[in-house]
Each structure stands twice: as structure tokens, then as C-alpha cells.
């Protein structure tokens, strides 16, 4: 079993299951590290035997010797895994959910740091001194720990959605979209938003918007 460099304290051995949002028992997109090909901003292509996506900030992790390291996202264009490709969008790596014509929907899953800190602050077993370290995210500094030891930890995660519109990436948010869409496309978007089952976190809803603003 590969060791994942993750936590500097075991004070987080409590569950996030009670939170009414998506949670994950792991801090990586995949349960195990796997081969990947990284396409760099300088034109180079690197084959990485053991790689993963770190949910703290949706960045690339790779194993080098006995260490797990985090790549500089700015140096990447995309990362190809066997069944999923991640593209650099802003400061995160996001995978393609689906396409609609020439446009597409992308998603990056990251830790919900606000909910994470609040749950830490509400835990009566953690002292004020511990809270300062945990809330500052020092617990996510690297120290070797076996993934199997993390079964009882559940981390809150949130999806960040992006549209690729006319070869430009836009963070999916009503305000952002209204800035880039013309009056007619804004009207079409609002018609979808008024549907009873619409949600900004529902991929079917977001793809429906992408369809009507073509």
C-alpha cells in the first residue's frame, strides 16, 4: 500500500458524515495513485508512473521516491489519466463533464474549507490551540500516513463548475454568465433557471443552460 503524504496530526479522527453536503473519506480524486501523462505549459510531455489529484486545491500529486509531491499547477496545461483528462482552468485542474456543440462543462472538486473550519471549531475535543493549527490548514501539510488509517475521516467537498464558451473559460455563476452573455442568451438562461428542478449544482441543469445559450 502506497503511503500518502497528508496530515500532521490525528486530531481529525472524527466524521463529517453529519453534514448535509457531499463528503469524501479521501483527499484525492482516485483511491489509488495511477499512471498519467502531464502536458506542460512549456511544451514538454511527462509520463508519471504514480499520480493523483489533490482535493485540497484540485492540484496534481505525484510520487517521487518515498515522497509525495504537489506539482505547480501553473506549469501544467492538462493531465491525462486512463479514463479522465484534467485541464488547467484558472488555478485548478478540472475534468470535462460533457460537451454541447463546441462548448463544454467542466468540474473541479475541492475541499469546502469554510465548512471544514466550522466543523473543526465546533468539535469539543479540540482545544483552542489545536483549532489555530487546524483552521489554518496546517493539518494538510505533508507527513506520511497510511490511507487505511483515514477510514473514519470524512471531508466536505464542493464542485466548481466552468463553462468553455467560445474557447473562453467562465466560472459557472449567474453573475458571471450575465456579464458575458448577450440579452437574448440571458433571457434563455433565465428561462432554464425558472424551471422547478433547476440547481446550480446539478449537472443536468448546467448542461441545459449550455444548450440554450448556443
Where do the model's predicted regions map?
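Bacterial Sec-dependent N-terminal signal peptides
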Residues: 1-25, 209
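A broad, structure-centric signal for solvent-exposed, well-ordered loop/edge residues
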Residues: 7-8, 45, 179
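Short, extreme N-terminal leader segments that mark the start of a protein/domain
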Residues: 20-76
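Aromatic-patch recognition
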Residues: 51-172
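A short, solvent-exposed beta-edge/loop patch
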Residues: 146-210, 214
Amino acid at each position: 500500500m502506497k503511503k500518502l503524504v497528508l496530515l500532521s496530526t490525528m486530531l481529525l479522527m472524527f466524521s463529517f458524515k453529519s453534514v448535509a453536503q457531499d463528503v469524501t473519506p479521501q483527499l484525492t480524486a482516485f483511491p489509488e495513485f495511477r499512471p498519467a501523462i502531464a502536458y506542460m505549459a512549456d511544451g514538454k510531455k511527462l509520463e508519471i508512473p504514480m499520480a493523483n489529484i489533490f482535493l485540497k486545491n484540485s492540484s496534481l500529486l505525484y510520487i517521487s521516491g518515498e515522497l509525495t509531491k504537489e506539482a505547480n499547477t501553473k506549469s501544467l496545461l492538462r493531465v491525462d489519466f486512463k479514463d479522465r483528462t484534467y485541464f488547467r482552468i484558472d488555478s485548478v485542474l478540472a475534468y470535462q463533464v460533457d460537451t454541447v456543440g463546441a462548448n463544454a462543462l467542466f468540474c473541479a472538486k475541492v475541499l469546502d474549507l469554510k465548512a471544514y473550519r466550522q466543523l473543526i471549531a465546533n468539535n469539543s475535543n479540540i482545544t483552542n490551540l489545536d483549532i489555530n493549527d487546524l483552521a489554518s490548514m496546517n493539518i494538510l501539510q505533508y507527513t506520511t500516513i497510511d490511507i487505511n488509517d483515514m477510514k473514519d475521516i470524512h471531508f466536505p467537498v464542493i464542485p466548481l463548475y466552468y463553462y468553455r464558451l467560445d474557447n473562453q473559460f467562465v466560472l459557472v455563476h449567474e453573475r458571471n454568465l450575465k456579464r458575458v452573455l448577450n440579452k437574448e442568451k440571458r433571457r434563455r438562461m433565465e428561462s432554464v433557471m425558472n424551471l422547478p428542478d433547476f440547481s446550480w449544482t446539478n449537472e443536468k441543469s448546467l448542461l441545459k443552460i449550455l444548450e440554450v445559450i448556443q
